[in-house]
Amino acid sequence: MEHKNLRSTRRRYALILIILVGIILTSLALINTIGSDSSKNQLKDNHFISKTISVGSFPVGISVNPSTNVIYVTNNQSDTVSVIDGKTNSVTKTIKVGDGPAGISVNPLTDMIYVTNYYSDTISVIDGKTHVVVKEIPVDSTPWGIDLNSENNIVYTTNYFANTISIIDGIENNVITTVKTDKPWGIDVNSHTGHVFVANRDSVNVSTLKGDVMEKIAISDTPFKISPNNVSYNEKTNLLYVANSSLISVIDISTNSILEPISVGMNLVGLTINSDTNMIYASDIQNDVIYIIDGSTHMIKEEIKVGDHPIAVEINPETNTIYVVNEYSNSISVIIS
């Protein structure tokens, strides 16, 4: 009997041990699975270059039509605009424009594209349905930046050496008026609020224009340390971001107050924002990288190596695809996650 009880006891202990081992192994497997899933989710947040698209000589400007998923790139020395299909990420057409095309902006509601021609002092107007230039609009000297208000169909161009902003009627495609400012370069227009923001490159300030009211916001008292190249506005947070030489200035538009800047990079030029995700994208032409910055914390999330001299960056908010203009590589980096 004692031997039977002993064997029975041993069997029970063995069974318990087997069960415990099974529980431990199951737990470890579960942990590994969770870790694996977490790793997969983390990878989804990591961006990478999915394709590099060859375009014309010295591309400098880019605009995306999210309604048609078509991307337009200005090729400064080729005097052309490359048309890219966002589905295939391939060039479908090349359009001849004026001398030295630089800035470009598309109205998704009318499917009209506007191009600044830096050396011929004109704006080329392209019909997005036919991709044919339908008009050339004379403006002041050396137009560079351009953006538009899609709701009232008003187009704004920065004329660098003329120290002016041309305001154009997008229906008649004629200049309505011209506003004075100081060495304007980058520009961002918000269609919902009607605000126009301009980076005055040599004056260390930003102009804000709404209606006929022009204000200037000084972003630094050290004019030799920074140079405002570009601006981008997040209407949901009411914050304006300014790409400078080695930092991004942050302005609270509700009070026009300067907040803590974002220290990043060496020479920031390209700048864009996805207001829906509150993510900021900035290009550094010295380090040849794109910085992805969390708009809620102003911390750098990712740093992506791209082509040579990334002068501009744009995002399609519908597909969350990022397009980077590599000026010296004559290419576009397509970044996805």
Each model region followed by its residue ranges:
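N-terminal Sec-pathway targeting helices
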Residues: 5-19
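Predominantly soluble domains enriched in secretory-pathway, periplasmic, or organellar proteins
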Residues: 23-337
